[in-house]
Structure formats: structure tokens, C-alpha cells
Amino acid sequence: MKKFLAVIFSFLIFANVAFATTSYDKYGQKTGSYRQNGSTINLYDRYGQRTGSFKKTSNGYNSYDKYGAKTGSYKTHGNTTTKYDRYGSKVGTYKTNSSGVTTSYDKYGRKTGSFKTDSSGRTTQYDRYGRKVGSYK
């Protein structure tokens, strides 16, 4: 679940997420939600229990678990966001192209998935093979 949320928010950093966003699995079932309050984005599971947060920095976000312990960071430069673990080691990158499609890569540069937003504002997440994983609206 933590890894899943990390991937989601790496994308949302690019997308300038609206005040509230709901996540769904590939079957359309709600899996969680994200709510922005100033420079903080709070994460909730499907039952409304807070699971963590993201706090804006000068060039990205820091992530925290529900107890407030730092779990990682995301630093954005141009169209690329790099994810680091709590120790500062690179975990992966997220790159957005001119069409607005964000592709995720692991620390070795291998593609792990992508995110595409349609005209209605719904973002769909795909795995590395192009299969739908979930969506966000």
C-alpha cells in the first residue's frame, strides 16, 4: 500500500492535484483519497483513516507516515521528479512528456508504469505493460 501511494503522489506532484482527489482500483472501487490543506497533502485509506502526508518543499515534497516519521522525498527539476527514500537514496524517477503523459522508472531506468489524464480530468494509471491499474478523479 505504501509503495502504491508513493507512485500515486509522484504523479500528483506533476499534476498539481486539486483540493480533493479520490483513487479507484481497475474495477472502479474506491481505494483511498487525498486532500490538500495549504502546503500539506493528507492521505486516507478507503475507510477515511489517515495513512500519511506529503509536505511541500522548495522543489518538491517530503513524505511522512501517519506518525509523522519521514519516509522519503520527491524533488522536481523541469519535467522530471526523482524519488528518494528516507536515507536519501534514489528510488526512481517520473518524467512528463509534451503530451502530459507521465512515465515512471525504477532506479535503474526501467519503465514501471505510466499515467494519462483525459479531457474530463480523470487520470488513469497503467503498469509497465499498458494494463490499467487504477484511476484518480
What are these regions (language model features)?
Residues 5, 15-20:
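Sec/Tat signal peptide C-region and signal peptidase I cleavage site
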Residues 6-10:
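Sec-dependent N-terminal signal peptides
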